[in-house]
């Protein structure tokens, strides 16, 4: 394939990472981004790698699969991880970032790379004669989505996910909340709004009866479990939220707490957590409260949370439709298209779910696009690594039941020999093997 550059379509997490990886290998990149010419309802700025749903990149420990994935990406020179580390905000054991600072830094690193040319334009056709990484994300424009849909055998794979509301910290009644991380892990990074049993029951009743924004009548409500609207979770059962975002375990009342409680219990019946959303600490998001309620209903119901009675919402929760591909039938383990070999796909459209996973897919797609350009052999990462297991899973899953997947230890190749019963010790061993295998893979 004779060409002098590689196309990357989309400058989200996956596209920005792919473009950067290609350019770092000495190959010119044309990076196309339609924002600036055509906006989407969910994005607030024209910056790259904008975080729409949450500002958290989740756990950082190696005993957490996404923590392992992040460490692998660091070792592979990820621009997304480098920018995240530079803009992180307190979040206990998680890696959370200043949302605007993070996307601004990614934008600057990509735009200022001497081998990356940014083109602000909407692409409506899939190129046939140039190596191209398609990373247009869940909010792909209708025109291009139609072309991808045709590659996808006409099957419409989709699910809905949602973003949580963001609140002005100065409007939170601090006398009713307390600062603490679950199990006191890391620094006290979350504001916790405790509820008594009666407060929770009243809140649940209001939530399940609140009015939702309508979906298109011809579409079914299919949600990804990791980003499920809080009202959908509440309707599954009165205690479902108590095992999810309102779980009180490890969030005991502080000694100086004087607010309402159930008898002498040391732990609240339920807890709503708020996490810092920007470096200045002026904004907080309600953790796990992705929602599709009408905005007026969000204000009414969420102001029932102790401490939020007069809260000002700087952004209400929103929901959007995510389309994804039949990757088991359409993609190689390198994220290369089986039907149109000049194309690579990356990001949530491939069926990886989560910010870190999207960036990881862009990293692998970018590396392999560069290798194809240089006529080098493809790079298939070991299934013993987090980054390799994710690529293997989405390309080898049962197509009939394929759904988006977060990275987890269940998809990483099992350890050989006798099973280690202690979960933490087992995960430590898997992580140790993964990093050793990655280092060996990179030296071959």
UniProtKB/Swiss-Prot annotation:
Keywords: Cytoplasm, FAD, Flavoprotein, Methyltransferase, NAD, NADP, Transferase, tRNA processing
Necessary cofactors: FAD
Catalytic activity: uridine(54) in tRNA + (6R)-5,10-methylene-5,6,7,8-tetrahydrofolate + NADH + H(+) = 5-methyluridine(54) in tRNA + (6S)-5,6,7,8-tetrahydrofolate + NAD(+); uridine(54) in tRNA + (6R)-5,10-methylene-5,6,7,8-tetrahydrofolate + NADPH + H(+) = 5-methyluridine(54) in tRNA + (6S)-5,6,7,8-tetrahydrofolate + NADP(+)
Enzyme class, spelled out: transferase
PROSITE patterns: GIDA_2 (PS01281)
GO MF terms, alphabetically ordered: flavin adenine dinucleotide binding; tRNA (uracil(54)-C5)-methyltransferase activity, 5,10-methylenetetrahydrofolate-dependent
Enzyme Commission (EC) number: 2.1.1.74
Coiled coil ranges: none
Domain of life: Bacteria
Subcellular location: Cytoplasm
Pfam families xref list: GIDA (PF01134)
Residues reported to bind FAD: 10-15
A Gene Ontology term for the protein's cellular component: cytosol
Principal localisation: cytoplasm
InterPro entries per UniProt: FAD/NAD-bd_sf (IPR036188), MnmG-rel (IPR002218), MnmG-rel_CS (IPR020595), MnmG_N (IPR040131), TrmFO (IPR004417)
UniProt cross-references to NCBIfam families, sorted A to Z: gid_trmFO, PRK05335.1
Family statement: Belongs to the MnmG family. TrmFO subfamily.
Function: Catalyzes the folate-dependent formation of 5-methyl-uridine at position 54 (M-5-U54) in all tRNAs.
Record's protein name: Methylenetetrahydrofolate--tRNA-(uracil-5-)-methyltransferase TrmFO
Source organism of this protein record: Streptococcus pneumoniae (strain 70585)
Protein's gene: trmFO
